[in-house]
Amino acid sequence: MKKTIETIGPIHLFAWITLFQLGTAVVVPVGMDAKQDAWIVTLTGCLIGILFFAIVPGGLYRLYPSMTFTAYTRRIVGPFLGWLIGFGYLLYFMYIASRNTRDFMDLLIAAAYDATPMFVLGVFMLVAVGYIISLGIEVYARTAFIFFLMCCGVFIFIILLVLLSDLSDFRRIQPVLGEGWHPVWKALFPTGLTFPFGEMIVMAMFLPYLNQKYKALRITAGAMALSAILLCIATFINISVLGVEIASRATFPLFTSLSRLRLAEIVQRLDSVVLFLLIITSFFKIGTFMFASILAAHDLFKVRNYKTLVMPIGVIVLLTSLTIAGNSTEHLREGLKIVPYYMHLPLQFAIPICLWLVGLLRRAIRNRRAAASS
């Protein structure tokens, strides 16, 4: 594999991962089957996700620090099977980019653009994503840092507003574990585990570009922890403003919550703040999966310049997002009830674990042969 020229700084990767983890999870309810304990689902999923990433994808990264996921897959299991597995991940990354694009379009239509064709919204988003990707991974990561700072300011503003508003009641978050751990585990597996923390497997395509490789695992763990805290804050806001019953039934609870908040009849109708947050985080969620699919195709098909793949893969993502489901209800049902079992669990956990074990075995055999020959 050729030495990578473009590099990512640690702070830029941290910002990128945080925005990626927030993605559509910041507005789509996560773990609400556990009702008041949804925040425990988020924290538990984050803890498991950090441990898993440190052991399995992190272990693979330590074995092959200069190779992307699709590249070292061929090194581990051979060129033929490795290529097939890599191609499966290429399709997976494109599919999840399409799902997130559909999430983005559905929310914008439900919130403010009901008269705008879905196709137009998708084109605007994917053209913007494709343009930043075409500028290179370094520009993409630096752009993430700029918008990360803006999103931090938005979150601080939202928190202050909730604390000062008379519509929020944090007693609604109680009781903690009122029904025990069973609802938490039920909500955690598999949806709370695979979304969003299991999706970190996609970052295995980008870690080789980090210019301080020894910081990779600390950066990913810190970014995952911060995103979990922000998602917990969003859950607290939803439950304290709407109550647990409405928050658990709402399709986009954060949007509903902030549309109700007001401060002294001066600051009100803050649903536009949620739209801004959604556009930014969705941009980097869609862009990350699309970028990963482009790098995977670049590696598998030996394309000289990956930037030539931006348009064709962008068109595939757009068309798939438009045809993926008949309506938003069907789309959410598939994303929460079907995709986690049949796609996320095998591709986020099962296959990486197998690759890691085979990689360790191959290294042990190689070390034993080297010791025997010396």
Predicted regions mapped to residue ranges:
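Extracellular loop-to-transmembrane helix junctions
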Residues: P29-G58, K337-C354, R363, N367-S373
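Membrane helical hairpin/interfacial module
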Residues: G23-M118
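Membrane-interface interhelical connector segments
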Residues: V241-D271
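Selective recognition of specific alpha-helical transmembrane segments in multi-pass small-molecule
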Residues: T44-V56, Y89-N100, V129, M150-S165, ...
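Hydrophobic, membrane-embedded alpha-helices of multi-pass small-molecule transporters
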Residues: T7-V26, V41, G45, Y89-F93, ...
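Membrane-interface "cap" regions at the ends of multi-pass membrane proteins
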Residues: M1-D37, Y209, V358-S374
